């Protein structure tokens, strides 16, 4: 079984956006034992897309066409797919009524072109879009399948999980059984982690172990093929037990979509504690990470973005003498930021971020110099200094600072 992923979009071809959809779909297909054999990217030009689809159908049995399902002139995917298949477009009347009702409820003027989001090639099967307007499509032709999916990542992932994966599992029900589990680790170099995991699982046959590096974390996927689910889960349990006997201090949970922010929120919930933050170089990114977790309101009431020294003094009560003596980028300032926000909101945990995001130096310190302060109920205030590589850029320095802050809280809450 050969599968091909076709990504449609001039922005992707020109490198203006990163193609996360193709990576996501390829990963899910691998988990379903339907690995992609080819990936192609093409711009928003109908004739070129038609040639790409025709070529894909000569070498693949399963073809995915991703992106270009909007109502604008450059959204050419569904009409082009229909033309390539020699079919007319048909309208899903129920979905079209739902689109009209949605625009009416939101009090937004609807253009006639929006009907394109309710259309698909005649003879195909519409795929529901749980979080957007445009339908996808599943079309079977001469022993092959063409699948059309939307471009916006949130819509893409929702349609893949809710509409496409169940359809693939039903259609390819004779495929081999595949069972997998993802373990998440932090604070460990990938090469060292994988060497130790290999040593711990040498005597467990029939299990595949692969790693995927994320910012400041590593995902390790355990996979078993060709066994009934119960037997496969038992083998994975055995492997996980052997791995955690060696790597437990660096393990923070199970799941493909698990984030450290979610784990921290759950830890705080269990204690009945609340968290706040005072951010300088991260500019609210830490608080955004916390608020992205459903249910975060039970542990987070609010926080501070104190970019300027004057804001640190006014909002957090940091003595001017502290900043004047030690500087903004210092252990002392990070500590007083953490203590100040904790005190102001009367919560159990306060964290402070100060540093140099770059590209320029600040107070004689290079980009990538970061101090994080942590004030926690019943414990002495702790500070940690980071020396992040300046070449990764301003945004990466800010993102990594947030992740290291989450790590600091996580480890302290585990004690």
Swiss-Prot record:
CDD domains: cinA (cd00885). InterPro entries: CinA, CinA-like_C, CinA_C, CinA_KH, Competence-induced_CinA, MoaB/Mog-like_dom_sf, MoaB/Mog_dom. Gene3D superfamilies: CinA-like, MoaB/Mog-like domain. It holds the Pfam family MoCF_biosynth. Disulfide bonds: none annotated. NCBIfam families: cinA_nterm (TIGR00200), PncC_domain (TIGR00199), PRK00549.1 (NF001813). Belongs to the CinA family. This is Putative competence-damage inducible protein. It comes from Limosilactobacillus reuteri (strain DSM 20016) (Lactobacillus reuteri).
């Amino acid at each position: 079984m050969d599968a091909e992923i076709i990504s449609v979009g001039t922005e992707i071809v020109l490198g203006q956006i990163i193609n996360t959809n193709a990576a996501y779909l390829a990963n899910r297909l691998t988990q379903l034992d339907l690995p992609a054999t080819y990936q192609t990217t093409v711009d928003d030009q109908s004739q070129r897309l038609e040639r790409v689809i025709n070529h894909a159908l000569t070498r693949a049995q399963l073809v995915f066409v991703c992106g270009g399902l909007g109502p604008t002139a450059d959204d050419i995917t569904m009409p082009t797919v229909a033309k390539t298949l020699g079919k007319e477009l048909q309208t899903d009347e129920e979905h079209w009524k739902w689109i009209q009702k949605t625009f009416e409820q939101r009090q937004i003027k609807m253009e006639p072109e929006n009907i394109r989001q309710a259309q698909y090639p005649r003879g195909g099967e519409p795929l529901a879009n749980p979080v957007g307007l445009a339908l996808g499509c599943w079309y079977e032709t001469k022993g092959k399948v063409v699948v059309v999916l939307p471009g916006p990542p949130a819509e893409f992932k929702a349609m893949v999980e809710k509409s496409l994966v169940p359809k693939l599992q039903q259609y390819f029900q004779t495929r081999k059984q595949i069972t997998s589990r993802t373990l998440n680790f932090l604070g460990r170099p990938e090469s060292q982690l994988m060497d130790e995991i290999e040593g711990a699982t040498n005597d467990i046959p029939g299990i595949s172990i692969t790693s995927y590096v994320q910012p400041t974390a590593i995902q390790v996927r355990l996979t078993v093929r060709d066994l009934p689910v119960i037997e496969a889960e038992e083998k994975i349990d055995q492997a996980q037990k052997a791995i955690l006997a060696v790597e437990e201090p660096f393990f923070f949970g199970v799941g493909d979509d698990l984030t450290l922010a979610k784990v921290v929120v759950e830890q705080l919930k269990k204690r009945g504690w609340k968290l706040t933050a005072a951010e300088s170089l991260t500019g609210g990114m830490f608080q955004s990470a916390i608020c992205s977790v459903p249910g975060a309101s039970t542990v987070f009431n609010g926080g501070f973005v104190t970019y300027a020294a004057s804001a640190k003094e006014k909002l957090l009560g940091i003595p001017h003498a502290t900043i004047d003596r030690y500087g903004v980028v210092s252990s002392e300032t990070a500590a007083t930021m953490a203590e100040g926000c904790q005190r102001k909101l009367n919560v159990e945990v306060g964290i402070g971020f100060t540093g140099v995001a770059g590209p320029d130096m600040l107070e004689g310190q290079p980009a990538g110099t970061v101090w994080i302060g942590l004030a926690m109920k019943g414990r002495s205030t702790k500070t940690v200094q980071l020396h992040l590589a300046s070449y990764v850029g301003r945004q990466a320095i800010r993102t990594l600072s947030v992740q290291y802050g989450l790590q600091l809280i996580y480890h302290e809450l585990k004690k």
